[in-house]
């Protein structure tokens, strides 16, 4: 348990930041799932539209350093390949 006022404040801040970061990660996972679902449905136009919006989410979260930029690039690359590979 934090004893000093400074340590208590840092604990509060860490908790708030953790909650915010978890919600951002959840948003990331949801965006990726939406693209995968559109690909499975076979609708290329919808998949491309959802992919564009998910790229924005991925970049935003990487810019905030919630995920590493290389992980963001990997997600974008794999989703792009999946969308382009649709028949």
UniProtKB/Swiss-Prot annotation:
Keyword field: Ribonucleoprotein, Ribosomal protein, RNA-binding, rRNA-binding
The region annotated as signal peptide is: none
Q: Which domain of life is it from?
A: Bacteria
Q: Where is the composition biased (Basic and acidic residues)?
A: 17-28
Transmembrane stretches in the record are none
Tell me the HAMAP family matching this sequence.
Ribosomal_bS20
This chain's protein is named: Small ribosomal subunit protein bS20
């Amino acid at each position: 348990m934090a004893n000093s006022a400074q340590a208590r404040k840092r604990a509060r801040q860490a908790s708030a930041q953790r909650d915010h970061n978890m919600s951002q990660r959840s948003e990331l996972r949801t965006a990726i799932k939406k693209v995968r679902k559109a690909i499975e449905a076979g609708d290329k136009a919808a998949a491309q539209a959802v992919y564009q919006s998910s790229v924005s989410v991925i970049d935003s979260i990487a810019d905030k350093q919630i995920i590493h930029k290389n992980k963001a690039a990997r997600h974008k690359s794999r989703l792009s390949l999946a969308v382009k590979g649709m028949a």
